Structure formats: structure tokens, C-alpha cells
Amino acid sequence: MRAQPRKQKSGVYAGSFDPLTVGHMWMIEQGARLFDRLTVAVGVNPDKKYTFPLEERLVMLRESTKHFRNVSVASFSNRYLIDYAQLIGATHVLRGIRTESDYEFERTMRNINGDLDASICTVFLMPPRGIAEVSSSMVRGLIGPVGWQKIVRKYVPEPVYKRLLKSRA
């Protein structure tokens, strides 16, 4: 009996990545292992104010993920994540869970997405304790006081750190 060819698993991991953190990078690394192809998608919300413009966030993501052969970076706007996942042919949506409130929100979104397209599976990952509290808003909040550079450096990838230094010069 012949083995059936395995359908390629492709994931989409979306966020604002403003800025990209080591927590995001952990998620991307796991996604690159789980899926044959992973699209890291910067979602653009026209009602949200960003620290870095879209093009800069895309550049930082590309620089930080260039060592992954199966990871691509893109952006989308004015559409739901599930619609974007359908558009690019993703079989899975990858989401990170850091807290109970993250879980409650993501569970609700998973249920809604399942109603819209049950063929796209949502995968939840929980980051290790050492980076579970790291968020873009936390990083933004650390920037400014004397010595911020030393503290922030451990929470962001090198390309992001260099841009932060440049933007604060």
C-alpha cells in the first residue's frame, strides 16, 4: 500500500510587531518548526497609532527572520485574519497565549474563525516563563529613562535594537 502524499501545512502568524520582541521570535521559531511554510503577517489597523511605520516593521521582521528558509514576511489591512489566511492558502493560524485574558480572547477568536472557515485550524502556543511577560507595549514602556538601552537589548532581536538606538539618537 502506497503512502498518501502529505498535504503541506502552512501557518500564518499575525501581529502588529511594534516592535518585534524575543517573544515574537520564539513564536516564529516554533512556527517554522511546525509548518512547512510560515507567513509572518503585519496586520495594519488604520485606527491604531504605531511607533514604527509599516515599512520599518517589515524591514525589521525580514532582517530578524532571514535565517529561516520557510518563513516569509507580508502585511495585510482592512480584512480579518481568517480572510487573509484563506487568501494565502494557510492551513493554520498561529497564536501565542501568555495570560488567562489572552486565552479568553484567543479562544473566542478561534471559535469565530471556526464558524467562518472550519478548515483552518488555530494553534495556540505558550512561550516559556522567561519571555512570557515580554510584549511590544512593555518594550515601548522601557524606552526613555537613563540606561534603557541595556535593559531593552535583552527583549528585542538585534536588528530591532539597532533601529531603536537610531530612532532615539
Where is each model-derived feature located?
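Nucleotidyltransferase catalytic core that binds NTPs
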Residues: 1-169
